[in-house]
Amino acid sequence: SNTTANTLKMASLCVAAGARPNVISETIEAVSAARLELTKQIMQTIAFYKDNRVATIEISPAVMAILGDDTDGFVDIIRNVDTVDVAILLKGESPNRTRISLRSKGTDVNAIANHFGGGGHIRAAGCTIEASIDEAKSRLLEVIK
């Protein structure tokens, strides 16, 4: 976790100075109806593999054109499933180019990303595969043990 005793101390000082945590939280968590409609579409793409240890979620090129880089949180939705070890977010940049975000609870996803020319950290990594979302997903699933 990135939350330390110092983080909480600073938060305490902010509240003592007049910061209103509920207002901050509501502002950060606010979502438009349009964003929720897109989220609904994205949620319908969730799939599980390898005895529910691997989960995928997809964002089509059309939806990516609307969202831009605002894809935070989607990979966490599937990573938080109790049986899931490897969570894969597949973002279609174009019909034949897919950007991948990998997260894990135990598996070295950096090794998986390296296989496709990407990299990162043991528990969080990424890569780009010159293929459609379906083809990229198939290639990834072949590599994941």
Predicted regions span which residues?
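Hydrophobic helix-and-loop "lid/oligomerization" segment in the mid-to-C-terminal part
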Residues: 1-115, 120-144
